Structures are given as C-alpha cells and as structure tokens.
C-alpha cells in the first residue's frame, strides 16, 4: 500500500468570479486511485461564501482525477460542491447542471498576465514599457524577460504530466501577457481540465513570488490589450454535415441570444469588448471569415470545407467560467434544427 497525497480542489462561492480552493488529505491505495475509489470529503463553507457559520458543512464530491507531478505520490482531485446530504448540488455548483455532449469539442485559449509588485511583469516602476508590437510570440529578454518562459514551460510540463490536453503556449500582445490552450471532448471534460490548468498555474507561481492576473482588462482604458478566453467549438453535426444554410441559421441564433452569452462570458467584458484591440463591441453580434474583430471568427478552413468544422467565439474573457461558457454555446446550438442526414 502507498500513501497518496490527495489535493481536493473546488470552486468557492465568491461572485461574480469564483476562486479555486484546495486542501490535502492522505489516503492509502494499492495503486494510483481511480475516481470511484475517492471518498467524499467536507469543508467549512462559511469561510468560502458557501454557508453560514451556524450550519457550515459542505461536501466535496470528486468528479475528475489527475496525477500531480509536483508532489511525490500526488493526486489532483477536481470536485463539485454538494449540500450536506452529499447528493444535492450546492447553489454555487454550476458544473452539476450544465449541458454536456461528448460529441461537442471545445478548445479554450486562456490569456492572462504575470503580475509582480502590483504591475505586469516587465513593466517599469512608473509609466509603461515600449508600445505593443514586439511582445506577441516574441523571444529575447527585452520582450519576455527572464522568468516568464521558465514558468510557462514548467506549467506546460505539469499539465502534460497530469494528462491534461494542453495544446500550446505563446507570449501575447501585451508585455507580461501569455496564453495557453486546453482542448477537451465534452463541455465538462474541457472545463474540468481548464480549471485544473488554472489551478496548476496559480500554485506554480507561488514559489516565484508572482501573481496571475485573470482580469479581462487589468490596464484599463489604455492602448494595451485585454485578456480573453476564446472558445473554439464544434459539434459532430458541424464537423460532418454542416452547410452554409445551417451555418447562417446558427449565426442567427447566436445573434438572437447575444445577451445570454454575454451574461456568462465573464465580468467587466464591456471594458474589454470595445471594438478595439481585436474585439467586437459587447452589445453587437458579428461574424466574419478570419476576422479577429468579430464576435465569432470563421476560419478559412471552415468555409473551404463546405461550412464544416469549428468556429471561434472570441467574446469569452479570461475570468469566464468554462462550465457556463460551454453550456451556453451548446444551448444556443441546440436551438437550431438539424437535418436528419446520414453521416458518411
């Protein structure tokens, strides 16, 4: 038997953006534990905005498990928060009620800033560095500094070791801004892995004395890009049948449900979605081929393949909850009728 360090991780009850929480217990197993072997656990909900002090018990229900390469015999356990009966989802538990479809594929592009001493990493003590231009996918100390790349490479390795479907990294448009991409089949799986990747980044940067800033527009109304979490999505029907008529009906549905999407695409999006810095205005829906200034970017490959494949919704922001984002996208897609065609 081996003693494993089980890190139970969950989302707290803070609004509009939940925080990640985690605590460790030690359990013995003959080998790396399966999800079915992991027990329910409890925590003090009165300290996480999820209960009152006079009745503070909440329950953690494991829903996904990953190896933790940062610890000897480490296990990362993604959890849903349940009421004391262990069966009823807590009001803050969005995962329990979202739409899911294994045939729906999601690729999230998580942008963020490294922050040190209250400002983006690489910014001078006062004022600003050289304007945007050389930082996006840049190399060299003057562009990315001396520690950021070390962190993103270490984070990449931690994600891959955990079995997270991490698909890439790059320096972003603003100084101190980076991005990583997570892909998953099914909204719950994709979102589980994105939340776990966020957790690993936050935990990793502790030892560097650096914070992660997920706010979508941390530098305010300046000529510096904000941060998004663009959502690339497709369903089996979009990939195998599609067609221009279906695509146009789909875009009409996204237009009709504009405000439902904005409501779950992350707080303060009006500060980011201004029509500048590769964004579309938050209150107007648009789409265009290869257009990074549109609400939805349509890849050339999608059109060239007979309007089949994936699309990119560029409106979700860097603080958005991937559970709710994926669910809303599926909800809108499900409102559009599909022809009953055989899939070749």
From Swiss-Prot:
Coiled coil: none annotated. Keywords: ATP-binding, Cytoplasm, Ligase, Magnesium, Metal-binding, Nitrogen fixation, Nucleotide-binding. Residues 4-86 form the GS beta-grasp domain. Its main location: cytoplasm. Mg(2+) binds at residues 109, 111, 172, 179. Its cofactor is Mg(2+). Belongs to the glutamine synthetase family. This is Glutamine synthetase. The keyword Ubl conjugation does not apply. SUPFAM superfamilies: Glutamine synthetase, N-terminal domain, Glutamine synthetase/guanido kinase. Residues 89-344 form the GS catalytic domain. It comes from Bradyrhizobium diazoefficiens (strain JCM 10833 / BCRC 13528 / IAM 13628 / NBRC 14792 / USDA 110). GO terms for cellular component: cytoplasm. Two forms of glutamine synthetase (GSI and GSII) can be found in this nitrogen fixing bacteria, GSI is a typical prokaryotic glutamine synthetase whereas GSII is similar to the eukaryotic enzyme. It comes from the Bacteria. It is found in: Cytoplasm. It catalyses: L-glutamate + NH4(+) + ATP = L-glutamine + ADP + phosphate + H(+). Catalyzes the ATP-dependent biosynthesis of glutamine from glutamate and ammonia. Its EC number is 6.3.1.2. ATP binds at residue 167. Homooctamer and homotetramer. Transmembrane segments: none annotated.
């Amino acid at each position: 038997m081996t003693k494993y360090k089980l890190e139970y991780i969950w989302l707290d009850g803070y609004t509009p953006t939940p925080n990640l929480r985690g605590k460790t217990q030690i359990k013995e197993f003959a080998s790396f534990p399966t999800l079915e072997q992991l027990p329910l656990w409890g925590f003090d909900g009165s300290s996480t905005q999820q209960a009152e002090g006079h009745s503070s018990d909440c329950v953690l229900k494991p829903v996904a498990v990953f190896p933790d390469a940062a610890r000897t015999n480490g296990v990362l356990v993604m959890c849903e928060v349940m009421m004391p009966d262990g069966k009823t989802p807590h009001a803050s538990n969005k995962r329990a009620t979202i739409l899911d479809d294994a045939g729906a594929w999601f690729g999230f592009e998580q942008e963020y800033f490294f922050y040190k001493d209250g400002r983006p990493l690489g910014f001078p003590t006062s004022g600003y560095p050289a304007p945007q231009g050389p930082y996006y996918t840049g190399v060299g100390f003057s562009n990315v500094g001396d520690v950021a790349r070390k962190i993103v490479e270490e984070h990449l390795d931690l994600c891959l070791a955990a079995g997270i479907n991490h698909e890439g990294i790059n320096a972003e448009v603003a100084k101190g801004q980076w991005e990583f991409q997570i892909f998953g089949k099914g909204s719950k799986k994709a979102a589980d892995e994105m939340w776990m990747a966020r957790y690993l980044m936050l935990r990793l940067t502790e030892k560097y004395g650096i914070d992660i800033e997920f706010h979508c527009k941390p530098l305010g109304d300046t000529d510096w890009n904000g941060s998004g979490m663009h959502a690339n999505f497709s369903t089996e029907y979009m990939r195998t049948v599609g067609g221009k008529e279906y695509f146009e009906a789909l875009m009409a549905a996204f237009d009709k449900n504009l405000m439902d999407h904005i409501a779950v695409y992350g707080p303060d999006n009006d500060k980011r979605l201004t029509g500048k810095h590769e964004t579309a205005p938050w209150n107007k829906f648009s789409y265009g081929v290869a257009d990074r200034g549109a609400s939805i970017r349509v890849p050339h490959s999608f059109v060239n393949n007979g309007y089949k494949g994936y699309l990119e919704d560029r409106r979700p922001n860097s603080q958005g909850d991937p559970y709710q984002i994926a669910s809303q996208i599926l909800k809108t897609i499900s409102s559009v009728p599909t022809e009953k065609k055989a899939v070749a």
